[in-house]
A protein has these predicted regions:
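C-terminal functional extensions of proteins
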Residues: 186, 195-207, 215-247
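N-terminal basic/disordered segments at the start of proteins
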Residues: 6-35
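Glycine-rich, highly charged phosphate/nucleotide-binding loops
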Residues: 46-65, 169-178
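Internal active-site segments that recognize and position negatively charged phosphoryl groups
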Residues: 117-149
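N-terminal beta-loop-helix "entrance" segment that forms/cooperates
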Residues: 20, 30-53, 108-109, 160-167
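Short, polar loop motifs at secondary-structure junctions
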Residues: 31-39, 97-103, 116, 135-138, ...
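Histidine/lysine/aspartate-rich catalytic loop segments that bind and position anionic ligands
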Residues: 142-173
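Glycine/small-residue-rich loop that forms an oxyanion/phosphate-binding "nest" at active or ligand-binding sites
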Residues: 59-116
Length: 247
């Protein structure tokens, strides 16, 4: 087996699993975090924290470190990072690890929207909302004074929540029982979610289905077309079949 120098753009559970797999396959792996989350779960192997300074900075890093393979395993909504990776990769093999999007079931009541602004507009007057969109984009919902509810995230938002909003700080995975309880206990009428996919947070959708609660589902942003796999195994197999490493 040829040892590869691999840079994983991480921050997801999938990225951690990939780092583990590639390291145990004998590769030289570094995982890079953007530094947005203050206390991320650490992967195996070497870790780099902080931005690269845009496309040029990432391109210089790939060259300086003699990276053979760049894997974009960031969140499906990390559009800027993915665009930078595509622009900077050059001759470096670029792969994307992206979990499949969730698909509405026949008994679901999903309201499909393109972005945060559309999600805010889609909520009816005086809705009791559960926000599961992370900490960065809470403000537009809070600005609608007729809305109330719960905002759940891993780390606190910089936005001050008014009295009619509650903050839940939790890290997934979540059970069906706990999701049902949150929706019921807070009298939630609408769930707002990004279509992140994956099993760690899927139970909120099952709970909403069971309670017949509408889901405002925000579509994934468009990303550059690159070779994409939905599983760690797919990435690992692809890398194992590559020719001689560069440099």
């Amino acid at each position: 087996m040829r040892v590869r120098k691999i840079l994983i753009l991480g921050g997801t559970r999938d990225a951690r699993q990939l780092a583990f797999r590639l390291i145990h396959a004998g590769h030289d792996v570094t995982t890079s975090f953007a530094g947005v989350t203050e206390h991320p779960v650490q992967p195996e192997g070497k870790v780099r924290v902080g931005g690269f300074g845009g496309v040029d900075g990432l391109r210089q890093y790939l060259k300086a470190e003699n990276i053979d393979v760049l894997v974009d395993a960031t969140h499906p909504f990390a559009a800027i990072i993915s665009a930078n990776a595509a622009a900077a990769s050059g001759d470096v093999e670029l792969l994307r690890l992206e979990r499949p999007a969730w698909i509405a079931q026949p008994s679901d009541n999903w309201i499909h929207v393109a972005d945060i602004a559309a999600a805010v507009s889609a909520l009816p007057a005086k809705a009791s909302v559960m926000l599961t969109i992370g900490r960065k984009e809470v403000a537009p919902f809070i600005a609608r004074l007729d809305l109330s509810g719960v905002a759940r995230m891993i780390e606190p938002t910089s936005v001050t929540l008014p009295a009619n909003w509650s903050l839940i700080l939790e890290r997934p995975p979540f059970s069906l029982e706990s999701e049902m309880a949150v929706l019921r206990d807070n009298n939630i009428t609408h769930l707002v979610s990004k279509n992140a996919g994956g099993g760690e947070t899927e139970m909120k959708l099952v709970a909403a289905r069971s309670l017949q609660i509408p889901v405002v589902m925000i579509a994934r942003p468009n990303k550059p077309t690159v070779t994409t796999y939905s599983s760690v195994e797919g990435i690992n197999t692809h890398i194992s079949k590559l020719g001689s490493p560069s440099g």
